[in-house]
């Protein structure tokens, strides 16, 4: 597969890193770890000033500050990786595979992905390989491939050529968690996306969420 792969992880998450390395080495996929941001170490005002999130992002009566900071840390991790990749020489022609460090890949991941890639419509910004709460009502565009409607989760996805530029220019500052704002852009036809159906990636049940159970 002619793709570039990064795994977003955080300092001290050795069990997750061993888990991801075992999977990807077993599948023969070269990858790099990307140092993510732990929300507890971020400052709300700085996130607003840097236009990562809006002030309204933190006006959430359902969730406390620790959860909102964890969501912001997740968003910042993805944003910084997109920025890094967009500045590189391969961003114009090589898809970018981004995995979070609890991604559980299908045993036939490489075979299935190699079948999907030629079917992805030209101009697609994001291919969701894992997702939640998706209706799967989108148009079938190829074997195992549908147009996305309103997918959530950033556990595992591919960004197509120029997709990082569109995400960076249209998504920030966020008013909601990053997966919600991405889904909103897709729903409004401001971002072109497809989903793998069925999924190639799910979140591993062996690790608890670092969003809903953030650590210091």
Q: Would you name each region that the model predicts?
A:
Residues 1-99, 103-216:
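An acidic/histidine-cluster motif and surrounding catalytic segment
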């Amino acid at each position: 597969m002619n793709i570039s792969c990064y795994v977003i992880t955080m300092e001290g998450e050795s069990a997750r890193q061993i888990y991801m390395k075992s999977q990807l080495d077993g599948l023969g996929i070269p990858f790099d770890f990307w140092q993510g941001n732990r929300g507890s170490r971020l400052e709300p005002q700085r996130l607003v000033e840097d236009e990562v999130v809006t002030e309204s992002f933190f006006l959430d009566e359902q969730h406390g500050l620790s959860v909102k900071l964890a969501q912001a840390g997740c968003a910042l991790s993805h944003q910084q990786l997109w920025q890094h990749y967009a500045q590189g020489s391969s961003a114009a022609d090589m898809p970018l595979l981004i995995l979070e460090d609890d991604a559980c890949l299908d045993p036939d991941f490489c075979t299935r992905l190699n079948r999907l890639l030629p079917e992805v419509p030209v101009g697609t910004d994001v291919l969701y390989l894992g997702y939640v709460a998706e209706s799967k009502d989108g148009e079938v565009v190829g074997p195992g491939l549908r147009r996305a409607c309103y997918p959530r989760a950033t556990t595992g996805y591919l960004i197509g050529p120029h997709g990082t530029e569109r995400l960076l220019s249209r998504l920030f500052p966020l008013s909601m968690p990053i997966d919600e704002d991405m889904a909103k852009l897709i729903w409004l036809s401001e971002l072109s996306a497809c989903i793998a159906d069925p999924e190639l990636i799910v979140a591993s049940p062996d690790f608890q969420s670092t969003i809903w159970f953030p650590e210091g």
